[in-house]
Amino acid sequence: MKRGARGDLKRVDLKGCIRVKGKSYISIVMVFLLLGCTSYPAARKEASPPPSKEMGRAFVREALQHYQFVKDPDVVNLVNSVGRRIVSKVGANPDSYHFFVVRENQPNAFAIPGGYIFIFDGLLLQLRDEGELAGVLAHEIAHVERSHFFKDDKKIAALDIATIAAILLSGGNPAALTLAGAANLDIRLQFSRDNEAEADSYAMRYLEKGGFSSEGLLNFFDSLIRYERFNPQTVPAYASTHPGLEERRDRVANFLRKTSDTPDTGTGTGITRNWQRMQATLLSRNITLKDESTLLQAMMIEKMPEEKREEALNYLLGLAYMKAGRYSDAIPRYLTAIGLNENNHLYYADIAFCYLKQQDIDKSREAAIKSILLSRDYAPAHVIMGIIELDSDNLTKAISHLDDALKIDEANSMANFYLAMAYRKSSDAGKEAFYSARYFKLNLDPERALKELNRAKDLVTIDTPMHFRILQEIEEIKREGL
């Protein structure tokens, strides 16, 4: 759902990618608004959030007014999975971290206090595999965990959240800074070389603990160096205050050489199916027929085993066309992929969605059922069946399928959306409000989520599991900001 939309829930597209406003910058920046250490106490109703969380929440509120986010689960789930995997292994609380994917062409990522990490899709498109993504996120997590500061704490403390957000969102653009009233202030957001070096050092430790190859950070620097060489005009002025990418790259390479006698047991940097799905999703917004070869090159089809290339080629082109809303172009590609491999549940779930969008319900149902028979652990197929049953007023079956989807992936926004619709049809206003709230929360609209949760709280029976769950959701939004 696009931000700014108001009113009752209505059917929305499952693609979930939204355009972005504004500029950014190439350097990896870490935004800290505090003068103290970040802490993660156990959540209690009566406890106030730590100062880092309060400042982070304030920044997120401001960011939601300037950024627009990629919400497609094929993108968001992968970033969350990699990020939470690292956080869980370094002694931090994974529930205190939030990962955002911003729709912006510039390669960039940054962290703010309290565990809020932003990565731009322009950076995701420059990375080559999950190992490099892990390197990016490990570096930002290290900034949070090591409680790094701006160079001039007193000057930073004098800036308000809106000004800091304006500086970061301007991408160093002088005109934008002037309009934001932040001209000549971006110098206050410079980072120390020691902090950047320490973040790199800890990132390598975090990668090892998380089961990723330590070379992920090195490969990430190589990707940024390539981008910088081909796009020198996009590097903002204050990026020079950070250690140069090549200097940082050499330092990491030297460290890895010194420890080369220790076996690296982390995950390699192979291109996974999930990574290719993410890349196809991000590339789909501008796809045309003449772009097919470019898209396939970006997803490195040539590096796949030769016997798998034709299947992968048709599958990924079908996926890109589906994400672009070009269902008539997607279906023949999926049919070819299915002809080459009739046992892949993803192909059937995706083509079921295409048929659903074309209102070919019989074919959609058949393909969704086939996907579920091949794998009961893929939420989108259950969502499609839930939608079909809901449209036929088979509410019991619809709720069953949508519940199954949430058991697999509780963050599936469409399962929450259609459950709200199902409970509306069944006149269960309390559950309708609860699942509406979950939908709004997952779509980064915490204000509407809180409104629906408070409505749900007044509609359900007190001291029931649903009542306690509603209270828990309310507490979490107030504590985390979303």
Where are these regions (language model features)?
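Extracytoplasmic and endomembrane cell-envelope/extracellular-matrix remodeling and assembly machinery
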Residues: A42-A47, R57, F69, N77, ...
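Canonical positions in the second alpha-helix
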Residues: K303, A337, K370-S371, D404-A405, ...
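Helix-start (N-cap) detector for alpha-helical repeat units in TPR-like alpha-solenoids
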Residues: E311, H345-L346, A379-P380, S413-M414, ...
